[in-house]
């Protein structure tokens, strides 16, 4: 079950969650997931990452954040966006967001 999150409501909705997984794609096209603590700045999500995530996001700028549910019956928040990378900081400009949980 998925519910669209309007981008103008995303910052408020993301405040209900804590940390997130940053999903990037490696050179061999395998996914790479790391835990991050994104913050908001100028309408974008900003996070400090390691070398591998920074290289991946530089090479392939389509990235995703997945905020896990607060409890086992809750929704995950999934945010797709475009990355800008400067040193070890990735800035995700949101393009789409959904709340998702398994169908019951």
Short names for language-model regions:
Residues 17-49, 78:
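Short beta-strand segments
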Residues 1-19:
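Short, basic/aromatic recognition patches
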Residues 42, 50-104:
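Short, structured beta-strand-loop surface elements
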Residues 13, 29, 38, 56, ...:
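Sterically constrained small-residue positions within well-ordered secondary structures
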Residues 7, 16, 35, 57-59:
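A generic structural signal for ordered alpha-helices
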């Amino acid at each position: 079950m998925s519910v669209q999150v309007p981008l103008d409501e995303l910052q408020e909705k993301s405040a209900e969650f804590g940390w997130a997984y940053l999903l990037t794609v490696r050179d061999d096209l395998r996914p790479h997931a790391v835990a991050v603590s994104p913050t908001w700045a100028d309408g974008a999500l900003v996070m400090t990452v390691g070398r591998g995530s920074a290289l991946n996001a530089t090479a392939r700028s389509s990235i995703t954040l997945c905020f896990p549910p607060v409890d086992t019956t809750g929704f995950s928040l999934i945010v797709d966006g475009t990355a800008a990378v400067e040193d070890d900081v990735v800035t995700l400009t949101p393009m789409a967001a959904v709340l998702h949980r398994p169908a019951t």
